Amino acid sequence: MPQAADIATAPQRPSAPGDVVAAGQPPRARGRAHVSSKRRDDGAVALDTLHQSGALKLLFPTGRPDLEAVTVNTAGGITGGDDFALTAKAGAQSQLTLTTQAAERVYRAQPHQTGQMTTRLSVEPQARLRWVPQETILFQHSAFRRSLHVELADDAELLLVEPLVFGRVAMGEHLSALRFHDQIQIRRAGRILFRDAIRLDGDAMAQLKRPGIAGVLSGPCTAMVTLVLASPGAEAALAWLRTQLPAGKEAYGGASLLAPNLLHMRLLARDSFVLRQSLLPILDKLTEGSLPRCWRL
């Protein structure tokens, strides 16, 4: 049971443009965005459509062969009652990369209020999409429901990465109370190709340290990443990837082919710094040296 002092000092997300305020209620943020890429007649990849509203914005760095879209949450984070939705499409024969400007922070929520983020991605024939957001950081007493749905054409390619951090280790935060429900689903030509779900209610640290989950580490697991590569190059990537995976007491990873041209990797780490030490070389390789610059800032 949280003490009064905990409630008084718990970090609160500041109000921002896009917040919706009801009488007697704290501000709630709403954000919607849609982006799509296309291949022009001259062969260049360009922005096709763009819609954005509320607290979810998109930026477009230049100087890349693909279209890179960087999402920005102007609310400064997510808390209970917030609602965000993103849709993106890589048009036929185009390449689209999506990332976040910074790590997404999920703050303390009030009782019976849950923040939501829904993402829907589609990849058309001979197109490639890279979904490489930076970490999502879950705070003590946060409540967050997240879903990611991907639709792939028969010959479309996908690199999907979802890093997750459990609490602020440097501040000694222990996630003994939170609600986190996460779902990833990938379909190819209408058929389910991959499905993954995480459900943590209550003491997340106690659940994570159980054998068969993240108990392989010497201490608490406070960071993890899920990676999926759907590409004809998946089998060749697997052999190299296994040489890069850590197998120690501070970080541990595994990778396998779930089906032809479908690679899945999971990596656990003591903290987000250790996670990045293992993850960045992998992402550099799988993105052919074109990982978005915001990952280095």
From Swiss-Prot:
Origin organism lineage: Bacteria, Pseudomonadati, Pseudomonadota, Alphaproteobacteria, Rhodobacterales
Assembly, per entry: UreD, UreF and UreG form a complex that acts as a GTP-hydrolysis-dependent molecular chaperone, activating the urease apoprotein by helping to assemble the nickel containing metallocenter of UreC. The UreE protein probably delivers the nickel.
Purpose of the protein: Required for maturation of urease via the functional incorporation of the urease nickel metallocenter.
GO molecular function: nickel cation binding
Stretches for region Disordered: 1-41
Source organism superkingdom: Bacteria
GO cellular component terms attached to this protein's record: cytoplasm
Places the protein is found: Cytoplasm
Pfam families tied to this protein: UreD (PF01774)
Keywords annotated in UniProt: Chaperone, Cytoplasm, Nickel insertion
Entry protein name: Urease accessory protein UreD
UniProt similarity note: Belongs to the UreD family.
